[in-house]
Amino acid sequence: MIRRVLPHGMGRGLLTRRPGTRRGGFSLDWDGKVSEIKKKIKSILPGRSCDLLQDTSHLPPEHSDVVIVGGGVLGLSVAYWLKKLESRRGAIRVLVVERDHTYSQASTGLSVGGICQQFSLPENIQLSLFSASFLRNINEYLAVVDAPPLDLRFNPSGYLLLASEKDAAAMESNVKVQRQEGAKVSLMSPDQLRNKFPWINTEGVALASYGMEDEGWFDPWCLLQGLRRKVQSLGVLFCQGEVTRFVSSSQRMLTTDDKAVVLKRIHEVHVKMDRSLEYQPVECAIVINAAGAWSAQIAALAGVGEGPPGTLQGTKLPVEPRKRYVYVWHCPQGPGLETPLVADTSGAYFRREGLGSNYLGGRSPTEQEEPDPANLEVDHDFFQDKVWPHLALRVPAFETLKVQSAWAGYYDYNTFDQNGVVGPHPLVVNMYFATGFSGHGLQQAPGIGRAVAEMVLKGRFQTIDLSPFLFTRFYLGEKIQENNII
């Protein structure tokens, strides 16, 4: 396929001819012709790269009903449910734009892969309960003909949350809500905790909650690849590139109290191709912002937050990249194979990794300790000073641990209330959000994808009401408080 692709600032690209076009009684193999011409030019100009003609078969289509910005688990989940819920096969054309198909800096692949239902908000509990069902039946949802079944390597060891005296009442209240929503969670006194987990030091622990079903951890990379494989089989298109611009129309409106607002509708997405100064315009009806830690930049391209401060028009998407470290250590005398993911009163956490006496964990920094998110370099002193002392206090065997490796990843951190943003923007009427989950987006992705697809296709949330997660709460100042974010 040859398509004229335009540098920034020029008009639309044109599709000139499809491969195999019949002409004069024979078939023209255009991809083959391009390859042949490139070889000839290279032979004439040895040692020089050939950019005179570009094979553009990797380009996005000129039109897509839905453009999803971000090809991580959240974006792929939205794509999956859009195709799953469409009225007939092929009714909706979906394009996923991902700037890095290696996912080297994507939050999904750098996650510790945990799933639990021990939240304080009913919506978060419901989302994680559905995700547990989705993961448990993964091959019913994501099976592809003639492809091997998925093995998420789910470890159902549960989550163990520890509370100090001042947080014990809140933990009891949270567990009551969790049980009402159907989660299987038990409360444990310090004595019960010592009996079940003799390796733990209960100093400073007044109460613990323990997830007995559908909690643990899984392979996030396997889920990502399984979703990608499935949506491709359903006809979802992919493009490696970066969204650099939206072309929109505007309409000035008056509210019921006679305040002027400007409604925008995106008509075209400009996708800058990988390692190129060229872009491809894509006409669309809907844009899904699932760009994770960089979703605020995508929102700003659409004009979100451009108005006067204190107005709905001037309300920005409060999501930014926050760097989080994960450390892996070895400790032969450490807790055994049935060790849950432990969340300490200090904020430190850990779990086992495999069968070889290895563990991984970390701790979210305070606001004053937040590292520079410009790169993914690891601060090993943070472990020595801020993580290890808490681990060694809670599990005395960890006094002799030896750090083996470490990595860093990004949270799509919602600075407003650390909860997700789901659904349409009130003024950019065809931009929908699936972002800002501040570390629990992976485990809730199946439910979030379904909710966004419902809103796009049906105009409302149908299975789980996620109205508290709408963008308008930022303008109204209505924080939703989730007490259990690790």
From Swiss-Prot:
Q: What is its EC number?
A: 1.-.-.-
Biological process according to GO: mitochondrial respiratory chain complex I assembly
One Gene Ontology CC term in the entry: mitochondrion
Domain of life, source organism: Eukaryota
Transmembrane domains' residue ranges: 62-82
State the UniProt keywords alphabetically: Disease variant, Electron transport, FAD, Flavoprotein, Membrane, Mitochondrion, Mitochondrion inner membrane, Oxidoreductase, Primary mitochondrial disease, Respiratory chain, Transmembrane, Transmembrane helix, Transport
Linked disorder reads: Mitochondrial complex I deficiency, nuclear type 19: A form of mitochondrial complex I deficiency, the most common biochemical signature of mitochondrial disorders, a group of highly heterogeneous conditions characterized by defective oxidative phosphorylation, which collectively affects 1 in 5-10000 live births. Clinical disorders have variable severity, ranging from lethal neonatal disease to adult-onset neurodegenerative disorders.
Supply the name of the protein.
FAD-dependent oxidoreductase domain-containing protein 1
Give the organism, scientific name. Homo sapiens (Human)
Q: What is the lineage of its organism?
A: Eukaryota, Metazoa, Chordata, Craniata, Vertebrata
Query: Gene name, please?
Result: FOXRED1
